[in-house]
């Protein structure tokens, strides 16, 4: 799908989405985006389980991208595995920064203390950008009540900088 087609698609879908449930939005998106070109990005946090459950109902093999920052607790990783098994998710892909980037940029593993933005870019943003290159769209768990900057989030939007369709079924 070309960028201009994506933009038109986003406008058209937002016009009809106000009548749809979150599950219906996921199912519709799953049908419309080419197989293998849609992913869910999830933290596997408590609120994220709702979205993971909805996705599992539509397609348990949909790629689910989980960012391992290498700073997560063992319990967090174990919880991610338990939730995946419980929901029957079969295509969870753990993404992380490349080891050589850690060694070069954050050799002591303390960048989060001195430059949180650089740490976030190294451990979250860069790996996510790399992983999303394979996809035309991605599902996000953003909600309108999560702050003033998200108060007007639409069900479908173009992800600036990535030229991907971003689907927000829980807005």
How should each PLM-predicted stretch be described?
Residues 1-171:
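Nucleotide-activated chemistry modules centered on ATP-dependent adenylation/adenylyltransferase
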């Amino acid at each position: 799908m070309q960028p201009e087609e994506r933009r038109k698609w986003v406008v058209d879908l937002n016009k009809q989405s106000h009548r749809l449930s979150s599950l219906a939005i996921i199912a519709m998106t799953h049908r419309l985006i080419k197989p293998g070109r849609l992913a869910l990005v999830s933290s596997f946090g408590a609120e994220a389980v709702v979205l993971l459950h909805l996705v599992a109902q539509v397609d348990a093999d949909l790629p689910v991208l989980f960012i391992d920052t290498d700073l997560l607790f063992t319990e967090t990783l174990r919880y991610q595995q338990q939730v995946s098994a419980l929901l029957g998710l079969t295509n969870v892909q753990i993404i992380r920064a490349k080891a050589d980037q850690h060694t070069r940029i954050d050799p002591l593993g303390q960048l989060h203390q001195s430059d949180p933005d650089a740490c976030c870019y190294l451990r979250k943003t860069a790996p996510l950008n790399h992983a999303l290159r394979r996809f035309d769209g991605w599902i996000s768990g953003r909600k309108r009540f999560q702050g003033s900057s998200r108060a007007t989030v639409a069900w479908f939007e173009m992800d600036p900088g990535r030229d991907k369709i971003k689907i927000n079924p829980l807005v």
